[in-house]
Amino acid sequence: MDVKVLRLGHRPSRDARITTHVCLTARAFGASEVILSGEEDPKLMEGVEDVVRRWGGPFSVVYRRNWQGVIDSWKKDGGEVIHLTMYGLPARDVVPGIMDNGKDKLIVVGGARVPGKVYSLADYNVGVTNQPHSEVSSLAVFMHMLLDGAEFDLKFEDARIEVIPQARGKMLREIDDGD
């Protein structure tokens, strides 16, 4: 199952930090790609690509102006669309039915104002709680549930550095090509 994330309504002047965190969370939890819509942001995309160069992949970030075209194409190719929204059905009730159905997933996370059409285009409108909170936290919790905790065992290809877990302190290890 391939998982990609569509970030709606990105605004470089206001959303650079939160969209970067959407990208980092998507990557760390096992998505293969984030698709940005809204305004194009080459600086953000270069920053995420730098993380992938250092910490490994595979992962990419691309820009598509037409978010509806992304959704339509995804559905035409047999994938399903999951919109994370506080107005959706509880994740704990919805995720078991979609996690093992074999379909690729496009997870849609909003920006400032989500177009109403997203709610009708989505196969599932899912609430990670029905309270206001961050799209980053929604994405992390949802992906953890969807992939049944698999993010804890992910290995990233071509990583140049990795964390050596410690009870106290911080330790990184540089990875040689021969490792």
From Swiss-Prot:
S-adenosyl-L-methionine binds at residue 84. One of its GO terms (cellular component) is cytoplasm. Keywords: Cytoplasm, Methyltransferase, S-adenosyl-L-methionine, Transferase, tRNA processing. Gene3D superfamilies: 3.40.1280.10. GO terms for biological process: tRNA nucleoside ribose methylation. It catalyses: cytidine(56) in tRNA + S-adenosyl-L-methionine = 2'-O-methylcytidine(56) in tRNA + S-adenosyl-L-homocysteine + H(+). It is an enzyme of class 2 (transferase). It is found in: Cytoplasm. Its EC number is 2.1.1.206. GO terms for molecular function: tRNA (cytidine(56)-2'-O)-methyltransferase activity. It holds the Pfam family Trm56. InterPro entries: Alpha/beta_knot_MTases (IPR029028), tRNA_m1G_MTases_N (IPR029026), tRNA_mtfrase_aTrm56 (IPR002845). It comes from the Archaea. Homodimer. Belongs to the aTrm56 family. Specifically catalyzes the AdoMet-dependent 2'-O-ribose methylation of cytidine at position 56 in tRNAs. This is tRNA (cytidine(56)-2'-O)-methyltransferase.
